[in-house]
């Protein structure tokens, strides 16, 4: 499909796969189909027969309890882990494991913002953002500088360009991490718990920046989060990992007012306050 970013098809994923080395990183946004984990020992299954599709320019949030495989899904999409079974399609194309030639092309088109920001401690903000651009030789020095400045302006961190990570608040570190990923011009951006550890002030300041980025540049985004209100504030669909599979995607309000088992579990506090 021309408008398809990511598709996961019949994916099975096991805990043992998460310690693997870099595999084949997707070239773009994708779809998962029947993704499964280990069949030999179901205790170690994280995902079993999961399917998910995502259109170009779409944003989706993945919710669910800790330890159920949400972050593992992101690692798999980014190429840091591989499914035991199933297929991942990036922009409508399946890239088999043996296509190692596609690795470098692929990983430049998938950005991954880790929960802890993962900034290089001895590099200033400007150099943290420029590092992957320089490593992959993505332009001349002048072109890289322009991209870095655009990323800093987008996430409003230019005033902190010459500061080191330890001099920044947690909220500002997350902004820098997002700027670093965005500067690579990814077609698919993965975010793992972007609001974790933020106070209300920093959270309120971060979400409009993410919203502005996706609307201005049509970036396709997958957000793994415990903060389900993100789906409401970004007006995007929300899916849950439930019984090792993805639910159908629905709006925040749908889940909030649903009488399903998932809604009663995940929205208990919000429903009780209505």
Language model features by range: what are they?
Residues 86-95:
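Conserved ABC transporter NBD signature motif
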Residues 164-168, 172:
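Conserved ABC ATPase signature
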Residues 189-192:
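Catalytic Walker B motif of ABC-type/P-loop ATPase nucleotide-binding domains
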Residues 95-111, 255-258:
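ABC ATPase NBD coupling module
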Residues 78:
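Helix-to-loop junction immediately C-terminal to a conserved catalytic motif
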Residues 185:
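Conserved catalytic motifs of ABC-family nucleotide-binding domains
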Residues 142-159:
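Conserved ABC ATPase "signature" region
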């Amino acid at each position: 499909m021309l408008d398809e970013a990511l598709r996961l098809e019949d994916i099975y994923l096991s805990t043992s796969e998460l310690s693997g080395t870099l595999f084949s990183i997707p070239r773009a946004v994708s779809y998962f189909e029947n993704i499964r984990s280990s069949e030999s020992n179901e205790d170690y299954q994280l995902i079993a027969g999961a399917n998910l599709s995502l259109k170009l320019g779409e944003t989706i949030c993945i919710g669910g309890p800790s330890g159920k495989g949400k972050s593992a899904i992101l690692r798999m999409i980014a190429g840091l882990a591989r499914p035991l079974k199933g297929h991942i399609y990036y922009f409508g194309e399946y890239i088999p494991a043996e296509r190692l030639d596609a690795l470098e092309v692929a990983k430049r088109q998938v950005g991954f913002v880790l929960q802890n920001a993962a900034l290089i401690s001895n590099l200033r903000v400007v150099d943290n953002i420029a590092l992957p651009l320089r490593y992959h030789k993505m332009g001349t020095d002048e072109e890289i500088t322009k991209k870095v400045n655009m990323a800093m302006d987008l996430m409003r961190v230019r005033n902190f360009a010459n500061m080191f990570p330890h001099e920044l608040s947690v909220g500002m570190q997350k902004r820098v991490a997002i700027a670093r990923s965005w500067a690579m011009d990814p077609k698919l951006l993965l975010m793992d718990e972007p609001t974790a550890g933020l106070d209300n002030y920093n959270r309120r300041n971060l979400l409009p920046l993410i919203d502005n980025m996706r609307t201005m540049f049509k970036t396709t985004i997958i957000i793994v989060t415990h903060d389900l209100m993100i789906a409401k504030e970004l007006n995007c669909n929300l899916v849950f990992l439930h019984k090792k599979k993805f639910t159908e995607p629905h709006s925040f309000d749908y889940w909030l007012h649903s009488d399903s088992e998932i809604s009663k579990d995940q929205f208990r506090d919000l429903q009780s306050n209505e």
